[in-house]
Amino acid sequence: MPQTLNDILSALQTAGIPFPKTPDYIENNLNPTFELRPYQIEAFGRFLHYLDNDKLRQKPAQLLFHMATGSGKTLIMAGAILHLYTKGYRNFLFFVNSTNIINKTRDNFLNPQSSKYLFAETIAFGDKKVQIRE
């Protein structure tokens, strides 16, 4: 039976192979009211390990965060976007199965007045400030 990516990453973790630490540019650019939980930090580590490992990564890279409702998947997506921005990506597309979800997600990504706004007040990579726009 073929191993899933989760199986492979779990085996690496069990073998004591460390995953990358969540970079400061992710932590500093996410909304500071949302403290990262241990499993979110692990999700970032797994994401970074997979994305930056040419031997492990399939191309085109396609990932799914299989996490419970309310566990912070959208925050993980925001952090993933921040990382991908450092790799030169500038456009991101979301597919969801309902208008309600896309409207909430849009608000969380684009509206700084939203109680669930995902980013810090200022998003910066070094001296470069970045604006999120639709």
Which sequence ranges carry the predicted segments?
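RecA-like P-loop NTPase motor core of helicase/translocase proteins
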Residues: 1-134
